[in-house]
Amino acid sequence: MGRRPCCSKEGLNRGAWSAREDKVLKDYINTHGEGKWRDLPRRAGLKRCGKSCRLRWLNYLRPDIKRGNISYDEEELIIRLHKLLGNRWSLIAGRLPGRTDNEIKNYWNTYLSKKVNSQTHQHEIDGDQVPLKKTKEEEVSEKPQVIRTKAVRCTKAYMLTTHLDDNSLITNKCPEPISTERSYSPSATFLDIPMDFDMDEFLAGFECDRNFDQVCDGENPLRLDDKMEEEWRESYECLQLNVDSDIRALSSALLDSEDDWKQNGGKDELMGGGNGGPSSVS
């Protein structure tokens, strides 16, 4: 079962409303009020459909209707409401006092839709052209930045000191034991030892020993844990043994060379005295 029709559609007037029909409809609604549109044509004596009577009253005959002359503010409101609600004209008309949904729909289709489409198209064109102009101006205004490097020669050695917390560890390790390039043997003579030997350069490698002594004596404020201290002590002992062995080798080489020199020197003196002997005898 469907919805029954409001009228039989037979013998009814169609087309434009006459002034007499408008007066009859207006007088009946002013007397009985709005509503019951299905029975209104029969009770008012009009040969019209109930829907036609309702639309005629709502869109033309109401006393509070504004007809034509839509202001700029109303146009902006219609545009914003259409973006929000779409083609729901009755809801849009409810937010515009005195305006009917039919009038707003007709005004939108004939004028406002074309205006909105033209503005949107113009914004798209402007949006495409402006970035191109900006990019060209930026390309012209941009200048290459030249970074000039400055050569710096380091003439001194700097030791960087870092402040560590109590819980931090020292990761610096002592350098490897110094190995002498020359090997000393007991057969080496005193003349084979270099005369330009620099004792300060030789002792410079033992700077780590003094630093380790300061750490162990408590002069250095840095704190070491047991494991790190044990590793340092082992490296220190190994370094000390290597240094002692090198010094002993150097000392023995010096002593052996001195003994050889004395022996060779004594023989030369004896031979020199022997040559002068006969002259004294004669």
UniProtKB/Swiss-Prot annotation:
Keywords of the record, alphabetical order, are: Activator, DNA-binding, Flavonoid biosynthesis, Nucleus, Repeat, Transcription, Transcription regulation
Q: Where is this region: Disordered?
A: 258-282
Q: Which Gene3D superfamilies match?
A: Homeodomain-like
Where the record puts its DNA-binding region(s)?
37-61, 89-112
Choose any GO biological process term that the UniProt entry carries and state it.
flavonoid biosynthetic process
Q: Which GO terms describe its molecular function?
A: DNA binding
Gene Ontology terms: cellular component: nucleus
Residues covered by the HTH myb-type domain = 9-61, 62-116
- Has UniProt tagged this entry with the keyword Transcription regulation? yes
Q: Where is composition skewed (Gly residues) in this entry?
A: 271-282
Q: Where is the composition biased (Basic and acidic residues)?
A: 260-270
Q: Where in the cell is it found?
A: Nucleus
What superkingdom does the record give?
Eukaryota
Pfam families reported in the protein's UniProt record: Myb_DNA-binding (PF00249)
Q: Quote the PANTHER family the UniProt record gives.
A: TRANSCRIPTION FACTOR MYB8-RELATED-RELATED, TRANSCRIPTION REPRESSOR MYB6-LIKE
Instruction: Please explain the role this protein plays, according to its UniProt record.
Output: Transcription activator involved in the spatiotemporal regulation of flavonoid biosynthesis specifically in the corms of Montbretia. Activates the promoters of enzymes involved in the biosynthesis of the flavonol kaempferol and the flavonol-glycoside kaempferol-rhamnoside.
The name this protein carries in UniProt is Transcription factor MYB1
Q: Give the organism, scientific name.
A: Crocosmia x crocosmiiflora
